[in-house]
């Protein structure tokens, strides 16, 4: 999980979602997981 000021999809499987008011990227590749913070 990477915590970044700006989250962007890295590949075509990355999905940008909102959980509990936080913007997150979920993906099949665990290296692509990101959270805005």
From Swiss-Prot:
Keywords for the protein's UniProt record, in alphabetical order: Ribonucleoprotein, Ribosomal protein
GO biological process, one term: translation
PROSITE patterns: RIBOSOMAL_L36
Domain of life: Bacteria
GO terms, molecular function: structural constituent of ribosome
Database matches in InterPro entries: Ribosomal_bL36, Ribosomal_bL36_sp
Pfam families reported in the protein's UniProt record: Ribosomal_L36
GO cellular component: cytoplasm; ribonucleoprotein complex; ribosome
Family annotation (NCBIfam families): rpmJ_bact (TIGR01022)
Similarity-based family: Belongs to the bacterial ribosomal protein bL36 family.
Annotated protein name in UniProt: Large ribosomal subunit protein bL36
Organism: Staphylococcus epidermidis (strain ATCC 35984 / DSM 28319 / BCRC 17069 / CCUG 31568 / BM 3577 / RP62A)
Lineage: Bacteria, Bacillati, Bacillota, Bacilli, Bacillales
């Amino acid at each position: 999980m990477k915590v970044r000021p700006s989250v962007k999809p890295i590949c075509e499987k990355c999905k940008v979602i909102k959980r509990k008011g936080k913007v997150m990227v979920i993906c099949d590749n665990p290296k692509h997981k990101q959270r805005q913070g």
